[in-house]
UniProtKB/Swiss-Prot annotation:
EC class (word): hydrolase
InterPro entries on file: Acylphosphatase, Acylphosphatase-like_dom, Acylphosphatase-like_dom_sf, Acylphosphatase_bac, Acylphosphatase_CS
S-S bonds: C5-C49
Pfam families linked to this entry: Acylphosphatase
Residue ranges constituting the Acylphosphatase-like domain according to the UniProt record: 5-92
Gene name for this UniProt entry: yccX
Protein name: Acylphosphatase
Length: 92
């Protein structure tokens, strides 16, 4: 499998519902590095790097709604090339 990185923006009721922490748990379970960060517009930015198949599994999880307490309306994503080395999956 090839290594890939994506950046995704998750919209809906995704702040104040444990979304970043649950995303971190799922990403670590899949062996991914990156981060989840709240944005000022109420969305969450997710950067995920790792094996292509595992990144795709995280994207499917995000698109399926994430944690039960969240309500995901849409997910936009594109390939990403982080400027530094990501060694863990963190909350920002």
């Amino acid at each position: 499998m090839s290594k890939v990185c994506i950046i995704a923006w998750v919209y809906g009721r995704v702040q104040g519902v444990g979304f970043r922490y649950t995303t971190q748990y799922e990403a670590k379970k899949l062996g991914l590095t990156g981060y989840a960060k709240n944005l000022d517009d109420g969305s969450v930015e997710v950067v995920a790097c790792g094996d292509e198949g595992q990144v795709e599994k995280l994207m499917q999880w995000l698109k399926s709604g994430g944690p039960r307490s969240a309500r995901v309306e849409r997910v936009l994503s594109e390939p990403h090339h982080p400027s530094g080395e990501l060694t863990d999956f963190r909350i920002r």
